[in-house]
Swiss-Prot record:
Species assigned in the record: Hepatitis B virus genotype F2 (isolate Brazil/w4B) (HBV-F)
Compartment(s): Host cytoplasm; Host nucleus; Host mitochondrion
Full protein name: Protein X
Residue ranges, compositional bias (Low complexity): 33-48
A Pfam family that the UniProt record links to this protein: X
Role of this protein: Multifunctional protein that plays a role in silencing host antiviral defenses and promoting viral transcription. Does not seem to be essential for HBV infection. May be directly involved in development of cirrhosis and liver cancer (hepatocellular carcinoma). Most of cytosolic activities involve modulation of cytosolic calcium. The effect on apoptosis is controversial depending on the cell types in which the studies have been conducted. May induce apoptosis by localizing in mitochondria and causing loss of mitochondrial membrane potential.
Gene from which the chain derives: X
PTM entry text: A fraction may be phosphorylated in insect cells and HepG2 cells, a human hepatoblastoma cell line. Phosphorylated in vitro by host protein kinase C or mitogen-activated protein kinase. N-acetylated in insect cells.
HAMAP family associated with the record: HBV_X
Subunit and interaction comment: May form homodimer. May interact with host CEBPA, CFLAR, CREB1, DDB1, E4F1, HBXIP, HSPD1/HSP60, NFKBIA, POLR2E and SMAD4. Interacts with host SMC5-SMC6 complex and induces its degradation. Interacts with host TRPC4AP; leading to prevent ubiquitination of TRPC4AP. Interacts with host PLSCR1; this interaction promotes ubiquitination and degradation of HBx and impairs HBx-mediated cell proliferation.
GO BP: DNA-templated transcription; symbiont-mediated activation of host NF-kappaB cascade; symbiont-mediated arrest of host cell cycle during G2/M transition; viral genome replication
Keywords: Activation of host NF-kappa-B by virus, Activator, Apoptosis, Host cytoplasm, Host G2/M cell cycle arrest by virus, Host mitochondrion, Host nucleus, Host-virus interaction, Modulation of host cell cycle by virus, Transcription, Transcription regulation
Region Mitochondrial targeting sequence, annotated ranges: 68-117
């Protein structure tokens, strides 16, 4: 990915909140243990509008030096919490916040990349995988015609 993402689970809604982080971002870090992700190198999140980057579908504020708006990615298929899915992402993240053993942050990062972004990339704007912009953000989500590809250049 072109930018590192900070993630935190909202257990009340089973929603994973993601936002780009970097040394140049002045946005407030997300509270809690999962928000305490060390900043990446200055080149990971550029100070300009990010229009040259390959992450299609993310609003331009994702790369703003003024601090990106929070992005909420939800995937009904991947975020289900059932007895038959004890290793679902919300369960893993909740156990980590309680200090219990769980899968590593590396696994969580891979999960996000492989399950959430890959689903969006392969399936396009699917009804069960949606992206919302929070915090009164006026930036619109712009997606190329299906399949929406986060990982190839425009």
């Amino acid at each position: 990915m072109a930018a590192r993402m900070c993630c935190k689970l909202d257990p009340a809604r089973d929603v994973l909140c993601l936002r780009p982080i970097g040394a140049e971002s002045r946005g407030r870090p997300l509270p809690g243990p999962l928000g305490a992700v060390p900043p990446s190198s200055p080149s990971a999140v550029p100070a300009d509008d990010g229009s040259h980057l390959s992450l299609r579908g993310l609003p331009v504020c994702s790369f703003s030096s003024a601090g990106p708006c929070a992005l909420r990615f939800t995937s009904a298929r991947r975020m289900e919490t059932t007895v038959n899915a004890p290793w679902s992402l919300p369960t893993v993240l909740h156990k980590r916040t309680l200090g219990l053993s769980g899968w590593s942050m590396t696994w969580i990062e891979e999960y996000i990349k492989d399950c959430v972004f890959k689903d969006w990339e392969e399936l396009g704007e699917e009804i069960r995988l949606k992206v919302f912009v929070l915090g009164g953000c006026r930036h619109k989500l712009v997606c190329s015609p299906a399949p929406c590809n986060f990982f190839t250049s425009a």
